Structures are given as C-alpha cells and as structure tokens.
From Swiss-Prot:
This is Programmed cell death protein 2. Zn(2+) 1 binds at residues 135, 138, 155, 159. A zinc finger (MYND-type) spans 135-172. GO terms for molecular function: DNA binding; zinc ion binding. One of its GO terms (cellular component) is cytoplasm. The keyword Manganese does not apply.
Length: 344
C-alpha cells in the first residue's frame, strides 16, 4: 500500500485468502487471526498489549502494510491495531508501528514469491526467527511457559489457563507436535486478507449530486422557500453524517480508508479530535492521520454477544509525521475512537 497519499483515499476490502498468503514473509495487510509480525525482534510485550482500561490481554484486530516510498529505513513498514474484546470492557485500543530496511535480518532482499509454498499446511507458527516465542492463544509475545512441558508459551496466566482448559492439559505430553494441535480458543477474530482499491476522484461528486436530487425529489411539491429554509436548518451534524453516507455509498463494503496526511472521514460532528488532542510522538514530531477503520468491519468479526461487545463508528489512526526510527522494536502510535451517536 502506498503512503504519502496526495490524492484520493485507498479503500480496503476483506477477502478470504489461503493461510500462506497471510504469513509475515508475504507482507500482508489483513484482519484477524494472529499478527503476522514484521520485525521478529522487539515485539510489544504483555504490558503494552494489555487493555489500558481492564488490564486483560487485547486481541489482534488488523494490520496494514504501508511502506514509505523514498525511505530506505521504511522499505517495509506495517501498522498493527489491537482491541479489547472482553465484556463488559471492550474499550481498549492500541496501535504499533514497525519498519525495516530492505536489507534486514529477517527477510529476503528480493520480493516474495506469488506461488504457494510446497508445504501449505495449517500449522500455527509460534516461534520467530529471532528465537522469540509466541502465545498459543493470541500469537503475541509469550514470555511465560508451561511448567510441565516447557514448550507451550503464553502472554499471560489468563491465556495459559484458557489453553489448559481447552486441550493443552491432554496435549502437554506431546511436545513434538504442539504447533499442530492448537485448539480454537474463541479469542481470535476471523481472518481475512485486506485488498486495496483506489477511490475514484470524480464519482463522489456525482453521488453527492444524486443524493441531493433524491432528497429534493422526495419532497414532492414543496415550495422553493421551504426547501431553502430546510437547508438553512440542516445542522452541522446532519451535514457530516450525510457526507459520510455519500462517500461510503460508492463502496459500501469498504472496511478501511488509507491516506497518509489526508483528512479523516468522520461519521459524526461529535467527538472529533482537535490538534491538541493528538499527542506528539515521543521523538518530538507531530502525528498525522494515516488510516481509519470503518464500522463495516464489525459485520465480519462475529463479535456480537449478549451485553456489551466490540463497537465503534470510526477508528482513526495517527502516526509520527517523521515515521521515526526508534530502534528495531515496535513504536506505539495513537488511536482516536469515534462512536456512532444517536443523531447518526
């Protein structure tokens, strides 16, 4: 996905894909499953991936592969978004950025093959080239390990207990085959590839005109004076939501809008951030908008539960304007959550 977008947004859509296409060496953009980590070193640890509100481990939501043209140190660059899916919280959000030069310790200098590998099994990859171990439940850094087999790794006691109840108790002795017998913990979101299309620059204006014509047409024989009066009384909230609906009506299945430095598409006039609300990067640079997650993604997550569940109107991600290089690890960036208001 290209960065430094000066034109229209790039739109993301979910598609089913074979598991090999969603592995780290393919540099995927994807939703759900386990993270396809970019750098195999310096992963965010359990404290960084704990919900800032309830303290429980967050689930991987999506990642966007977004290298920066002309930046040798960001030839590979990816953003990873996590959310809390534990009722009744379901509020915590965190996003991390990682980037690598083309010549690095983890990947070939040449582009990855488009052909499937000879072995395309469904084994879960729980060990990285750096030697780091991943949690069997969530695929994040797993510094804890089973005290019996010393082979199964976890991010937390909570995930260790969950895995024990759902099968590791019986599989613990089968230490040579643990990666092939990872149960479904009902913790991960469904996994999809994110495919990208560029939004048409002209069509939004056409749709907006059609939208206005439809509104006027449904008013029947209303007098011109009445129409002018209604236009004057249309609230800012109404205009913002109408713009949102008009934009997404072109591609109603879009789950993501990407454009580094463009303006976000808000769903509401309420709870939109001012410049002072977006914290600067620790390096001192300002943060700018990079992409947003649309509410349409919720339709694919199978996250509905009785009581509170994962929900949002817009998740807007702001990243360091300099895309600074702070070591080989993962740098936390900023997420702004805008909920769907009653007015919308």
């Amino acid at each position: 996905m290209a960065s430094e977008s000066a034109g229209p947004a790039e739109l993301g859509f979910v598609e089913a894909a074979p598991s090999w296409r969603l592995r780290s060496e393919q540099f995927p953009s994807k939703v759900g499953g386990r993270p396809a980590w970019l750098s195999a070193a310096g992963l965010p640890g359990p404290p960084e991936l704990a919900c800032p509100l309830c303290g429980r481990p967050m689930a991987f939501l999506l990642q966007v592969y977004a290298p920066l043209p002309g930046r040798a140190d960001a030839f590979h660059r990816c953003l990873f978004l996590f959310c809390c899916r534990t009722p009744p919280c379901c509020c915590g959000l965190r996003v991390f950025r990682n980037q690598l030069p083309r010549q690095n310790d983890f990947y070939s200098y040449e582009p990855p093959s488009e052909d499937p590998p000879s072995e395309t099994g469904e084994s879960v990859y729980l060990h990285l080239k750096s030697g780091a171990h991943l949690c069997r439940v969530c695929g994040c850094s797993g510094p804890k390990r089973c005290s019996r087999c010393h082979k199964a790794h976890y991010c937390s006691k909570e995930h260790q207990s969950l895995d024990w109840r759902l099968g590791h108790k019986q599989a613990c002795a089968q230490t040579d085959n643990l990666d092939n017998i990872v149960p479904d913990h009902n913790f991960l979101f469904p996994e999809f590839e994110i495919v990208i299309e560029t939004e048409d620059e002209i069509m939004p204006e056409v749709v907006e005109r059609d939208d206005e014509s439809e509104i006027i047409g449904t008013m029947g024989e209303a007098h011109e004076e009445e129409l002018e009066s209604m236009a004057k009384h249309e609230s800012k909230e109404d205009r913002i939501f109408r713009k949102f609906k008009t934009k997404i009506s072109l591609e109603p299945e879009q789950i993501l809008r990407y454009g580094r430095g463009i303006a976000p598409l808000w769903i509401s006039g309420e709870n939109t951030p001012k410049e002072k609300d977006i914290p600067d990067c620790p390096c001192g640079a300002k943060r700018l908008f990079e992409f947003q997650v649309m509410p349409q993604l919720l339709n694919y997550l199978k996250a509905d539960r009785l009581g509170r569940s994962v929900d949002w109107g817009v998740l807007a991600i702001f990243t360091c304007a300099e895309s600074c290089k702070l070591g080989i690890g993962y740098t936390e960036e900023f997420v702004w959550k805008q909920d769907i208001t009653d007015a919308a």
